[in-house]
Each structure stands twice: as structure tokens, then as C-alpha cells.
Amino acid sequence: MSAETGEKVVELLIPLEMYLQHGVHIGTKMVTNYMKRFVYKRRNIDGLAILDVRKIDQRIRVAAKFLSRFEPEKIMVVSVRQYGHKPVTMFAQFTGAKPVIGRFVPGTLTNPALEVYYEPDVILVTDTRMDQQAIVEAAEIGIPVVAICDTDNKTENVDLIIPGNNKGRKSLALLYWLLTRQVLVERGQLSPDAPEDQPAPVSEFETKVKMV
């Protein structure tokens, strides 16, 4: 309980330092009206918007609880953005979700004649701009959309926003690692007190950059 406000202080899922080290809170210079409520402040040195870590943490809890209500194979997780490919693949591996990485083929959710056609009950997207096709199709067939949204994202047709830096590879690794853990916790498949290397270390969720 906070002595100043009388509000109950909820402990973060992971240490604050871990969020900060992975840059999950670092937004962009642009802030859309949709994302203003998640911004903590602007950084004086460069004008970047800083997301409120407590709101990120709280939305991860809410999203994990929501996703855990669906059959694993009925969850589709999407990332056109390259830095989201490995995190999405790992999330799918441990949760049983259907991963779609790279180009999202138009009609994936709406055209049964396509080989890639799939019928999820919910989709999780990495970036509302990059994954717009998936969001449009989800809205067309009437299924909920959970989205990781940076400060510059628009959120039309998004049912549940997870604020966070969706451009950095370390940030996306941590966000998907934490979502994975929380979904498993909500399903009763992982203890809330499980070590940080379960179900796998966060480093294994990170897209590796090939040196040329």
C-alpha cells in the first residue's frame, strides 16, 4: 500500500532493471492519441516518449490471462517484422500457438481456398502497422486482436493493447518471453516462482543478427 496515495502497489512480474535493460519502455518521438495514456514522460535528451513500465507489466498480465482461455492451436501469433520472428516462434513452441512470420498472405483468415488458410479464435500481433493485413482480416471475421503497440502505433480494431517497444530485438524478446511465461502460469503449466531460465532463457527468444 502506498503511504502517499493509499493505492495498493503491485509487485512487477520481473525486476524493473530487467525491463529497462531490454529497452521495453523506450518509445518513439511520435505519440498517437491511442497511446498517450501509456506514456510516462518524454526524455529531455532526445525527445523520445517513455512508456510506463507498470502499465506494460499490467497489460502483459491481462493479455496472458485472456489468451490462456483459448485452445492453444486456436491462437495465431503474427510478426512481419524480422526482429519478431524468433520471439514469435518461441512463443508458439512453448504455448502451442500457430506462428505466422514474414509476409502475411492476404486471405489467410478469409479465403478457405488458400493452402495457408487458418481459423484461429484470437490473434496476437507484433506491430499494428506491419501486421495490418492480419488485423483487417481478423476484424472481418470477428475475432479479437491482441497487439503489442509502440507509442507511434494506431490501434483501430485492436481489442487489447500491450504497450511496449516493438522495434527492438531485445525488447521483443523480453515481451514474448514474459507473455510465454504468463500464459503458462495462467494455464497452471508453470509456477509463478519458476526460475528465469524457464521455459527457456530470454536470450533464446532474441533474433540473432548475422555479422557480414
UniProtKB/Swiss-Prot annotation:
The biological processes this protein is annotated with in GO are: translation
Query: What family does this belong to?
Result: Belongs to the universal ribosomal protein uS2 family.
Q: Which gene encodes it?
A: rps2
Asked if the record carries the keyword Ribosomal protein, the reply is: yes
Q: Which HAMAP family match?
A: Ribosomal_uS2_A
List, alphabetically, the Gene3D superfamilies matched. Answer: Glucose-6-phosphate isomerase like protein, domain 1
Region (Disordered) residue spans: 190-212
Give GO cellular component annotations, separated by semicolons.
small ribosomal subunit
User: What is the protein's given name?
Assistant: Small ribosomal subunit protein uS2
Q: Molecular function terms in GO for this entry?
A: structural constituent of ribosome
Q: Pfam families in the record, alphabetically? A: Ribosomal_S2 (PF00318)
The organism's taxonomic lineage, starting at the top: Archaea, Thermoproteota, Thermoprotei, Desulfurococcales, Desulfurococcaceae
Transmembrane spans: none
Q: Does the keyword Ribonucleoprotein apply?
A: yes
**What are the alphabetically sorted keywords of the record?**
Ribonucleoprotein, Ribosomal protein
